[in-house]
Amino acid sequence: MSNCFNPANILLQNDCIDMEKWSVIACDQFTSQADYWDAVEKHVADAPSTLNVVFPEIYLGTITKQENDCNSSGDGVKNDKETGRKTKYASMTDDERIKYINTTMETYLTDGTLKQVVADGYVLVERTTESGVRLGIVGLIDLDDYDFDPKKKTLIRATEGTVISRIPPRVKIRENAAIELPHVMLLVDDPIDRQKIDGCQGAIQEDAANIAAVKHGIIEYVYAIRDTLRKLYDTELMQGGGHIRGYAIEGEAAKQVTEAFAAKQESCGGFLFAVGDGNHSLATAKTCWENIKKSGKFTEEQLKTHPARHALVEICNLHSEALEFKPIHRLLTNVDVKDMLSFFEAEITKQ
């Protein structure tokens, strides 16, 4: 059996770029709050940013070509008649935005905006939010080990029903993209061996060779020896997003991480990772990969090493205290229904 979680070649922005402006939240967030994305666009302005290479879902399907032609102010930017907003991205049709994304990706790859910072390795992520410090390891998964069909018992499985109609627009965005900017989080059931982790605080370089021996709390163990790793970034995140640090896991340490997760895979009983966030993004990656396999354009040997076979994800521990599981639905009691509906209508109109 091949490993389903593997090292990657990972790109980041060059050192001259403001990372606080470079980093934006996942594209499927704030889908009913246009003011949030307007503020992000204003804050980023003309600076290099991942805002320019993602498609916030709030804008999907909102502007047709005819509407764009009618509302354009002549500079390619639509004036919103109701709010007076003037934003570049709120004015684009889906096709225009996707073309812009693909072009900008190519530009970032050729003009030095992006550079490879990790070769055949991983990134250890430390994300501070209101709920605490969440740790993760970024690497590649094999999409042949994942399926969003609940009937398939794969190593990597979805945690929510996939809305098939949501996949085609995402496929259109992904299929010609030169780079991948994921927000997919996978959860591993890996109870933390606190005694072993506490014992390696202040660790020295040799402790990296012990990662493969860790049976429980792989991510937490790597974090405990983070001072032996090369720091890649350390920045505040915009719009109250918290703080983030990243460390390169390379060389022997990367080999040890691969071995540790391979051992976890062997003992998991056939279910290693659950998709905690980004279900539809990963379903889109899977769909693109299946389309490539069915295209007949590649030999079996070529498919084995095709880049679309893999997706970049962050592995997080299900046992992390910083993970909060909240219900999607809310029950309102003792309210006047008409007043409540009027309030909701007024709030939506503001958007």
Language-model-derived ranges and their functions:
Residues Q239, A254-G296:
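Active-site beta-strand/loop microenvironment that shapes enzyme catalytic pockets
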Residues M1-L232:
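N-terminal extension/subdomain marker
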Residues T235-V257:
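Portal/gating segments that form or line small-molecule/metal binding sites
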Residues D277-F344:
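Catalytic or ion-translocation cores adjacent to nucleophile or general acid/base/metal-coordination motifs
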Residues I204-G240, P327-I348:
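Compact, glycine/acidic-enriched structural inserts
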Residues S49-L51, P182-V184, F271, A308-E314:
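Structural beta-strand/beta-sheet cores of well-ordered domains, especially the beta-sheet scaffolds
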Residues V171-N176, Q265, L272, E301-Q302:
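A generic local secondary-structure boundary/capping motif
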